[in-house]
């Protein structure tokens, strides 16, 4: 009976191995049931090309060669525009002060018999006042534009 006992032990061992394999298959199956999705996720797709550091440095240098002159020209034009507006502002301030001085001089001039206010001189005075107001408005507008450009 020892022969049958040996066979029985082999059968028992085989059944234990089958049980272990079945549980291993169940464990693996639960682990790979999502395998198609994982396969799709792990699929190699290049969203970004990998380049060497030397190539990156070369491309950055080339980019700088292209962009720096453009930016320099733009900044120069901006500085020229600002200086032009500054000159216009200074010119308008000077013109305003001159007109204001002339107007004050006309207002402060004593009324004499030699200087009689005629309709022509009153019209000139009105024209000067209107021109002065226009210059004040223009000066304020240029000042605001200059402040906006400096602010940005």
Curated annotation (Swiss-Prot):
Q: Which InterPro entries match?
A: DASH_Spc19
Keywords, comma-separated and alphabetical: Cell cycle, Cell division, Centromere, Chromosome, Chromosome partition, Cytoplasm, Cytoskeleton, Kinetochore, Microtubule, Mitosis, Nucleus
Q: Name one Pfam family in it.
A: DASH_Spc19
Among the entry's GO cellular component annotations, what is one? DASH complex
Q: Kindly list the places in or outside the cell where this protein is found, as annotated in its UniProt entry.
A: Nucleus; Cytoplasm, Cytoskeleton, Spindle; Chromosome, Centromere, Kinetochore; Cytoplasm, Cytoskeleton
- Please cite one Gene Ontology biological process associated with this protein: mitotic sister chromatid biorientation
**Superkingdom of source:** Eukaryota
According to its UniProt record, which protein family does this protein belong to?
Answer: Belongs to the DASH complex SPC19 family.
Under PANTHER family, the record lists: DASH COMPLEX SUBUNIT SPC19
Assembly and binders: Component of the DASH complex consisting of ask1, dad1, dad2, dad3, dad4, dam1, duo1, dad5, spc19 and spc34, with a stoichiometry of one copy of each subunit per complex. Multiple DASH complexes oligomerize to form a ring that encircles spindle microtubules and organizes the rod-like NDC80 complexes of the outer kinetochore. DASH complex oligomerization strengthens microtubule attachments. On cytoplasmic microtubules, DASH complexes appear to form patches instead of rings.
Summarize the protein's role.
Component of the DASH complex that connects microtubules with kinetochores and couples microtubule depolymerisation to chromosome movement; it is involved in retrieving kinetochores to the spindle poles before their re-orientation on the spindle in early mitosis and allows microtubule depolymerization to pull chromosomes apart and resist detachment during anaphase.
Q: Which protein, by its recorded name, is this?
A: DASH complex subunit spc19
High-level lineage: Eukaryota, Fungi, Dikarya, Ascomycota, Taphrinomycotina
């Amino acid at each position: 009976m020892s022969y049958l006992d040996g066979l029985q032990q082999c059968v028992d061992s085989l059944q234990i191995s089958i049980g272990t394999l079945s549980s291993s298959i169940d464990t693996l199956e639960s682990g790979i049931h999502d395998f198609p999705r994982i396969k799709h996720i792990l699929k190699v797709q290049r969203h970004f090309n990998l380049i060497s550091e030397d190539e990156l440095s070369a491309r950055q240098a080339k980019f700088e060669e292209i962009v720096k002159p453009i930016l320099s020209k733009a900044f120069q034009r901006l500085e020229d525009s600002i200086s032009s507006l500054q000159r216009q502002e200074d010119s308008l301030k000077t013109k305003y002060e001159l007109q204001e001085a002339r107007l004050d001089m006309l207002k402060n001039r004593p009324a004499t018999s030699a200087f009689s206010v005629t309709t022509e001189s009153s019209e000139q005075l009105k024209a000067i006042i209107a021109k002065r107001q226009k210059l004040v408005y223009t000066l304020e507008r240029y000042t605001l534009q200059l402040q906006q450009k400096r602010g940005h």
